[in-house]
Amino acid sequence: MVEEISPKYTNEQAEASSSSSSSVSGEPKDFSGSLENQEDLGELIERTNTMTSGAESKVETNRRMSRILTGTQDDPEKIAIDYSNCPPMGGDRPFPPALPEQSQFEVTFDGPNDPIHPFNWSMKTKTIICIVLCLNCICISMGSSIFASGVPQICKIYHVIPVVAILGVTLYVFGFAASPVIYAPLSEVYGRRGVLVISAFGFAVFQFAVATSKDLQSIMICRFFGGLIGAAPMAVVPAAFADMFDVRVRGKAICLFSLGVFVGPILSPVMGSYIAQRTTWRWLEYVTGCFASALFVAVALTFKETHHPTILVQKAKEMRKSTNNWGIHAAHEHVELSVSEIAKKTITRPIKMLFTEPLLLIITIYNSFVYGILYLMLEAYPIVFVEGYGFEANGELPYIALIIGMLVCTAFLWYFENDYLKRIQKAGKLVPEARLIPMVYAGVIFPIGILWFCWTGYYPHKIHWMCPTVAGSFIGFGLMGIFLPCLNYIIESYLPLAASAVAANTFMRSAFGAVFPLFAGYMFHGMGTGWAGLLLGLFAAALIPVPLFFLKYGERIRKNSKDAYYA
């Protein structure tokens, strides 16, 4: 989840913000001002910035900052406390004397080189955690589409039409919409580790529950809860990467996360087809459950807490235990989970922003359409290669071209990440519109890939199967090259309200991903592969001007918006 920050967020802090969908407590920064005793004040403010939790009350933060800047210190002997309205202590015990200001005994990181700060962990530790979390994302996203390989068997066993059986995919993806609502706030209060470990365990359990279900209703219910419980990595992993990596590396790490999210649904049909042809559909879920169980063990053993405020809570607990001094504490220990605040940030405000912010609405529609095409292709590929070209045993192998296109695009985005860092360094502030440059290229390639794939696949008796296969690499490039820049642009355009903006995007994106597979079969069979592709390709082509429009007018739109970030 991306923490929502004050609109007074400075440019220096913004530069240290994540290019991902996540933001955490900022790096320790030196105070730069014209006050006396600047060095001492800088140290205090550095400590305050580091230990302040994103869920902490803004009022409390402002009070602390006011005390620091004015040099006010509370003298316990001069403070009169009125105990007249308090009940007695009990046992004839006297009321305690006035205590020093609580903030004097708050623990914080010991400077920017503190070894417990995730930024300072060894690269080996970070790499292991990164690999495990990316594999976890691949497993969760694989679970969404691997069920589609068993649809023919489910239709035959339970006597239902394909659109009913494919609901197993739809309900699973609908569960993803819960990730910004449930798991992001929980991870900000209780830390990343607990949320990810519990999610990994619950996801594995529900995969086995689907595999052993006796009726269709149980299958659908367990599929929904599998997606709902397993969705935590979709929101928490980007936040964990933001905890561990600074702005120079963070964007590249998020590229790997996005690659995992996209590769999973494409890789699972390749695996699923072999499993379904040689066994029953239940082994699709057994295999996913075994993979999820292994990752649950890996997450539990290798993943260390990365959430900065939660690390300080653990530090305070250890210090209290070793010193028996109950006054030592962390600021985050006083944070409580507010249901009303969660509802406001993740439900009410996102819906309002979606329909009042044209920038957010247009980019979200583009992003959601691309995500929907990802799941639509799961239905289109069997129609083209199995029904059209007669691929019986290896009908899902052409999916590999999609993955190749995504890998090429990842390298392409890594190159532009370096270019983006140079741009913000030169500008001295965030430049959200610069995120859209790779999207201009991907936006042109994407409709070309769709039209190429569908029209060559429309004539299987005249055109070799390699033609639509190669076209898949263009689609994969476009999927990745549009999705990630869209997400980054939303985050940096609505930096003060990034969590709400990302939640709005996730809601609509999940809805598109869930619904597109339902009509894909009817569309391709009813209209024909070529004409269905023409409709989708023209819609994708109509969206090509979107990044160009915001490259030219985006800054002006943000300046006139009441919610967008503008420096």
From Swiss-Prot:
Look up the record and give one Gene Ontology term from the biological process aspect.
Answer: putrescine transport
Regarding the membrane, this protein is recorded as: Multi-pass membrane protein
Name the principal localization, coarsely classed.
membrane
Where does this one sit in the cell? Cell membrane
What did gene disruption experiments reveal?
Leads to intracellular accumulation of clotrimazole and increases the susceptibility to clotrimazole but also to other imidazoles such as miconazole, ketoconazole, and tioconazole; as well as triazoles such as itraconazole and fluconazole. Also increases susceptibility to other antifungal drug families such as the polyene amphotericin B, the pyrimide analog flucytosine, the fungicide mancozeb, and the polyamine spermine. Decreases virulence in a Galleria mellonella model of infection.
CDD domains reported for this sequence: MFS_Tpo1_MDR_like
- Chain intervals for the UniProt region annotation (Disordered): 1-71
**Up-regulation conditions:** Expression is up-regulated by clotrimazole.
Q: Which UniProt keywords apply?
A: Cell membrane, Glycoprotein, Membrane, Transmembrane, Transmembrane helix, Transport, Virulence
Per the record, the similarity remark reads: Belongs to the major facilitator superfamily. DHA1 family. Polyamines/proton antiporter (TC 2.A.1.2.16) subfamily.
According to its UniProt entry, the function of this protein is described as: Multidrug resistance transporter involved in resistance to azole antifungal drugs such as the imidazoles miconazole, ketoconazole, and tioconazole; as well as the triazoles itraconazole and fluconazole. Also plays a role in the resistance to other antifungal drug families such as the polyene amphotericin B, the pyrimide analog flucytosine, the fungicide mancozeb, and the polyamine spermine. Decreases the intracellular accumulation of clotrimazole by mediating its extrusion from cells. Involved in virulence by conferring resistance to the human antimicrobial peptide histatin-5.
Q: What is this protein called?
A: Multidrug transporter TPO1_1
